[in-house]
């Protein structure tokens, strides 16, 4: 065990966390972790299976007197995000994670810690290794490649798991029980255009919106943050109605799962309108700044002269593009009827003028209800098809709708109250979890997701709040002790 982890409690959990942090396990490169899990099972004479995707399942029989209880699946993912500070010398495919204790926090030395979801893996291993914990039949499942596409959960075939209840150990706030997540899909539109000449004596300028807060397009979609792409589209729509405008370039947004922070377009208008468009831009900027005065305190608007461009997007395609960007839905579409949570949303993620005289627009839709996700994807698809674009809706991944009658939720809440004297928070998340895929492949599987407190995940600032590991460990043991008998 790492020197800094010798004294951490619970010892049985941190012993295994230290072990697996010596094993390189980048997403899509989990072979050594799979081999470790298989050897772990052999050494303890536990039944072990691996499916064709690389997911590993280890079964353990019930302790005496618990044989008639429902089978519980405990699930975590074996891969980790591999990020390091620029100055740090570290090879994620060879080196062991170096850890240190900072007060109540466990950190890594300039790299991701791997507690997402290594601490979940460690708790499963500690349970499989223990001889003094009461439980019914259990299946410990370790999925691969969660971080870069959920491919382990995607590839899992129905029947691989056989339990009645699933405890997902991949949440990041102790005291919170997650019972719902959104499914998602990407919708991409592609416009073809004919390059045209810009008339003589036209003023070329670049408009840019930047410095926005941004954030996750699911988790942060309810925080009233501005979308840079929609702001840009709004200005272009107004300018198109007033000026003889040519669109020469547009580069806006970025990742499909991020609220756009920056957007830029290069345009041309008659030279006589040069000063007028500057006034319009300033007035427009003031309006938008007032609208988002609370959430966008660092938003910046720029208009700069540009050198002349030889070509622009043909007028008809430019008009259809701008009008569609103005019209297409962005943000929350509906809220859940079961809890205070966004149910369905859409994000206008990126707009790119590319080589080959094409403009590519990427959007993403999310919902915890499959039919609602299809509906919002079709709304976006129809808007772009009306404008003559080719549109493709990706296969996507399913959501997980809250079950208000969930037995495992009731058990998790009551055992938490008995242990800690307070109510846990019951929440959903407007983002994807492996539970969404499990709910599709295993209809009727009763699930809840929870875990110890993590901060800075997916970054070298990742850290684990040590005392919460013991709390979650005790909660798991209490849940297992209270699992009901099979019907």
Protein language model regions, located:
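Acidic/His- and Gly-rich active-site-bordering loop/insert found
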Residues: 3-105
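Zn-dependent metallopeptidase/amidohydrolase metal-coordination segment
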Residues: 5, 9-13, 343-359, 364, ...
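Active-site metal-coordination/substrate-binding segment of hydrolases
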Residues: 66-148, 153-164, 204, 318, ...
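Acidic, glycine-rich active-site loops and adjacent beta-strand->loop/helix elements
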Residues: 78-80, 141-149, 171-174, 213, ...
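Midchain, well-structured core segments that form catalytic/ion-binding scaffolds
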Residues: 104-107, 147-148, 154-366
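Active-site-adjacent substrate-binding region
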Residues: 220, 227, 234-250, 402-445
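His/Asp/Glu-rich mid-to-C-terminal helical/loop segments that flank catalytic regions of hydrolases
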Residues: 225-242, 271-274, 319-324, 332-336, ...
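Substrate-recognition/cap regions that form aromatic- and gly/pro-loop-enriched pockets
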Residues: 341-431
